[in-house]
Curated annotation (Swiss-Prot):
PANTHER family with a match to the protein in the record: MALTODEXTRIN IMPORT ATP-BINDING PROTEIN MSMX, SN-GLYCEROL-3-PHOSPHATE IMPORT ATP-BINDING PROTEIN UGPC
Bilayer topology: Peripheral membrane protein
Annotated protein name in UniProt: sn-glycerol-3-phosphate import ATP-binding protein UgpC
Domain ABC transporter: 4-235
Entry keyword set: ATP-binding, Cell inner membrane, Cell membrane, Membrane, Nucleotide-binding, Sugar transport, Translocase, Transport
MF annotations from Gene Ontology: ABC-type glycerol-3-phosphate transporter activity; ATP binding; ATP hydrolysis activity
Protein EC: 7.6.2.10
Quaternary structure annotation from Swiss-Prot or TrEMBL: The complex is composed of two ATP-binding proteins (UgpC), two transmembrane proteins (UgpA and UgpE) and a solute-binding protein (UgpB).
GO BP annotation list: carbohydrate transport; glycerophosphodiester transmembrane transport
Enzyme class: translocase
Job description of the protein: Part of the ABC transporter complex UgpBAEC involved in sn-glycerol-3-phosphate (G3P) import. Responsible for energy coupling to the transport system.
A GO term from the CC aspect: ATP-binding cassette (ABC) transporter complex, substrate-binding subunit-containing
Amino acid sequence: MSKIVLDNVRKSYGGNIEVIKGVSLEIADGEFVVLVGPSGCGKSTLLRMIAGLESITSGTISIGERVVNNVEPAERDIAMVFQNYALYPHMTVRENLAYGLKNRKTPKEEIERRIAKAAKVLEIEQFLERKPRQLSGGQRQRVAMGRAIVREPAAFLFDEPLSNLDAKLRVQMRVEIKRLQRSLGTTSVYVTHDQMEAMTMADRLVVLNAGHIEQVGTPIELYEKPASIFVATFIGSPSMNLLQSPESAAWQPGRAITLPSGGYTFGVRPEDIRILEEGDQDADGFNAQVRIEAVELVGAESYIHAALSDGKPLIFRVAGRSTHNIDEMVRVGASATDVHIFGADGRRVSD
């Protein structure tokens, strides 16, 4: 196991197109860090730079105590798991697992020991003599992970490994990957655009936006205290409701809210909004009169899509099956502890 340190890492193409803009990050020994962000934010490029598949323009990357800027990928003591399984179709599972080790002149007895250990951990012992075409998508992904595990590397790098799987299998595999990483204790960097994967798997999240880091923290820290409007809207589904200043007759901040001078954006998550029944006091964080436009039942809860009196959208969640009707007018509110205030620059105003 090894820590990974990025110090002011930059990547430019053609000398003037900068895609990674001074990223500094320390990943602790044994930590599972997820790089997350929209398409084009630089997360896969950054992972490939750690792996040595992309050169860096400036800065340093260290794995363990060694600066690896000019070290070949094969010498960095890392193992990658890709979106595409990249298995040799003419080889058995056993041969696929052994291939890289044979190229490194690993003794035969050691190869067999590592294969047996990985196969047991991944529960693929019964598939060792099969070829990839005889396996399901989930089984192939386990083999791809096994090929990384037998390397016994200092770090695992995962590049959107679940993207080709169906929704049910993705849930199963993300649990398995996290369980496996915890049992092995291997430093891991995982790239995804799927916030559900990011939130459920990460020890820490790194949210990237246009080549720079927006925020680093645990999933709950980013969810409860987003550092910017970008993070607030990217983390969480449905997305956080955002209302621009100045407030109007359509909505009002509560009596317990202190607003910054100048422009601001007021945020509240769908699950923090409640319907105020007749006779309720106004909520101390946020109040609005809304018209219900649509109701989505998603099993144990319903999402209500509504409109403020000025036409701006608002979405909120209620438990179970909603009994409210389309075009019904309701008053909603939120507590002061559940609202988020962002300044004119889009950054969070200190609580």
